[in-house]
Amino acid sequence: MKKLLVKNIGLLATPEGKSAHRGEEQGKIKFLKNAWVLIEDGIIASVGTGAVPAVEGAEVVDAEGHLVTPGLVDAHTHLIFGGWRQNELGLKLHGASYLDIQNAGGGIQSTTNATRQASEQELAAKASKALDEMMGFGTTTVEAKSGYGLATEHELKALEVIKDLNDHHRMDLVATFMGAHLVPAEYKSNREEYVRLVCEEMMPKVKEQGIAKFCDVFCEADTFTVEESRQVLEAGLKYGLRPKIHADEIEAIGGSQLAGEIGAISAEHLIVCPPEGIASMAKGGVIACLLPATSFNLGAVFAPARDMVKAGVPVAMATDFNPGSCPCLNMQFVINLGCLEYKLTPEEVLTAVTLNGAAAIDLADKVGSVEEGKLGDLVIWDAPDLDYICYRVGSNLAKTVIKRGEIV
């Protein structure tokens, strides 16, 4: 049995439980001073304070009085893609909007072209490098979407890459099928046929492949309507894929209301989410997966996070790592923005990037808190307390990252 003992933890900060926290519960964090954590064969065996137990054969890590939290959970990424889109920066600086760039042949379609041309090996190598960087910032679990293939062969290829990464990289990954990311150029004059392709051809093969756990759709002006999104998500449910939905990122066309109606596990973005959307999500038990770094990169407003907390909607936060609207893979920056722009407390933010993020990908029983029986995923921070990592913008404060009981 492999054992790792983390001792001399100045302050251990963790949410507790195996489900998402909402309302006042979102800000409830357990703090333990002078703590220790014992991990056996990758699983947390015990957590305590005071005298450190003598554990025969254990590797000992001295936290040197620093802060320790659960490993961070990045519950929304577009990890698998070819190329980059730095050429769009100048267009943005001259006033082009996200939809302007997309409608001119850039945006998602540009990345789709590059992704289709890339081999599985090329996509895996690129994504593996990104995962290394993510882990260096304290992320230990990642959701990864397909969605830059937009053809059956290439969507399945992206999901195979995610499986390969999950099998061979230290990071734990969960796959989401997102064939409904955009109507590709070859179907612009026949979008109904593309929706049919996603629902009737891609979905059965995704189920047969057995990699994806979720189905996502981009419900937005100039992408997929509410009814098209409903059609996609209902087809996903038919094939055993739990629904997620990109909603209210640019225009509020009803995506957040659909999330509540269909019982989505999470709704993403929600930058311009209206009160009726918040109410629908609260009623439907939907987790709001907010992406503040995307607002930052787009120069957009920030999602009404406080209104969601007040309404009893569980709030998670993630990077939205992608080559266009958010080439950011640093969850520490997400933490900073959660406090500075959403005005969430450090405690609410910690829950958002750990337990609620885990719940948004149906892993709250395995990760997201430092508790007996969960995976031994920890971050030792170069910080004395939780406030410090929220207020120190622009520095990597992850001193030591531990994944399944092993030092990364």
Regions found by a protein language model. Give the residues of each.
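Non-catalytic positions within long, well-ordered alpha-helices that form the structural scaffold/packing
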Residues: 135, 199, 207-208, 237, ...
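N-terminal metal-binding scaffold of metallo-dependent hydrolase/deaminase domains
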Residues: 1-54, 386
